[in-house]
């Protein structure tokens, strides 16, 4: 499956803000955005004022980069969001939040969504007792996500268990059992990503 293989820190510089794509490193002085907060490239330091289209496009790119989704997947997710009841932009964020890789990240099994995606792809998780290694798998309310028995002894998972993460309202966790549960669909106020989804809807509505 296609994925972005370029320099991760350049993505934050391109969007003009920290997207926290590299986990703990983003909170330190080693973060590239701290040292060079302007866009990459020869003319990056002199940002031009964006047109309405440019602003909408940047918002879409930002959302794609935060969730680690490429254009085709993102477009398909938006088309699904449009067909759902409710507000298309909020539906889009809800669908992105309920990807398995994002849920694993929200449960604290990964310092970043990138790391969580790798853990899913390597087969470390069960959903309702069945192994799922597809990062884009959509979880549902009442689904139970569990770390595979053979993975629990690794130092990485022990570290996650010893340093539990604050959870959003729509998730519950049983740290001792290496288990998390989706107890509700995320509401917009539960989604703490710096994205204006209305701009994305406007872009796709053209």
From Swiss-Prot:
It comes from the Bacteria. GO terms for molecular function: rRNA binding; structural constituent of ribosome. SMART domains: Ribosomal_S4, S4. Residues 98-163 form the S4 RNA-binding domain. Keywords: Ribonucleoprotein, Ribosomal protein, RNA-binding, rRNA-binding. Part of the 30S ribosomal subunit. Contacts protein S5. The interaction surface between S4 and S5 is involved in control of translational fidelity. One of the primary rRNA binding proteins, it binds directly to 16S rRNA where it nucleates assembly of the body of the 30S subunit. This is Small ribosomal subunit protein uS4A. The gene is rpsD1.
């Amino acid at each position: 499956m296609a994925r972005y293989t370029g320099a991760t820190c350049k993505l934050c510089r391109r969007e003009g803000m920290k997207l926290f794509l590299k986990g703990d490193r983003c909170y330190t002085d080693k973060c590239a955005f701290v040292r060079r907060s302007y866009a990459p490239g020869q003319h990056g330091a002199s940002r031009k004022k964006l047109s309405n289209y440019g602003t909408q496009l940047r918002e879409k790119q930002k959302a794609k980069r935060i969730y680690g989704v490429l254009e085709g997947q993102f477009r398909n997710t938006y088309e699904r969001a449009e067909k759902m009841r409710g507000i298309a932009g909020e539906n889009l964020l809800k669908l992105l939040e309920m990807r398995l890789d994002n849920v694993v990240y929200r449960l604290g099994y990964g310092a970043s969504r990138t790391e969580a995606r790798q853990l899913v792809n390597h087969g470390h998780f069960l959903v309702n007792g069945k192994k799922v290694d597809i990062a884009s798998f959509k979880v549902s309310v009442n689904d139970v996500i569990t770390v595979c028995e053979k993975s629990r002894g690794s130092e990485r998972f022990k570290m996650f268990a010893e340093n539990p993460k604050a959870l959003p309202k729509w998730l519950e966790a049983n740290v001792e059992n290496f288990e998390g549960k989706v107890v509700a669909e995320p509401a917009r106020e539960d989604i703490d990503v710096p994205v204006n989804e209305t701009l994305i809807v406007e872009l796709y509505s053209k």
